[in-house]
Amino acid sequence: MIVYLGMPKCASTWLYDKIKQNFDYDGKKEPHTLVEYGTTNNNLIDFSTNNWSMDSSTALKIDKDVSKYIFIVRDPIELAISYYMQTRLDGESFNDFIFSLVKTKLICFGDIVERWYKLVDKRKILIYDYNKDIQGKHQSFIADICKNLDLDGYDQTVPLQDKIFSTHNKPELKCTDANLNAIIKTQVEKFKQITQG
């Protein structure tokens, strides 16, 4: 089984649509059953973007059936802007949105990878950085991930550079809360230390 651990707004739909032909599964990309019910809805693939937050007991239960986990991160502020443009509530400030992402741990990549490295064999976790490994490098990324997932190929009917969902005319937004910025910086540094150390 292949399990996508995260994050949203990191090309998960694009990747899923490219590789789903390799699996005898015609269900939803994001069934959300691992987080909501503690169980799989199939034994092949789950690209729910909230899988990173599943209970530890669920992770331990399914791990024997998982061949690879995919963890894609992105510059946290860039991710937040894309997510904010898609999901913000009326009147919600960008700082408030960032606060909610930090509070729910969604952009706390250091804490997330630390937890997962303790839960499962870290060699099973494929880690990619959207900004460094995917953006502008679609061909090398798809070749690498297909090799690492032991897949026969990918859907070539749509050009690799075409995205399924793209946020156009993104505004320039900044988090002006020094405490939140410090937390984000600490998380990025922790992530780098854990994954590169």
Language model segments and positions:
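Short, solvent-exposed loop/turn segments at secondary-structure junctions
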Residues: 8-13, 31-33, 50-53, 74-79, ...
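Hydrophobic alpha-helical segments typical of transmembrane helices
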Residues: 38-41, 112, 187
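PAPS-dependent sulfotransferase catalytic domain
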Residues: 3, 22-25, 56-155
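PAPS-dependent sulfotransferase catalytic core
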Residues: 1-51, 87-92, 140-142, 147-195
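A residue-level signal for conserved active-site and pocket-lining positions in enzyme catalytic cores
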Residues: 11, 112, 191
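Surface-exposed cleft-lining segments at the edges of enzyme active sites
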Residues: 48-50, 94-104, 132-133, 167-178
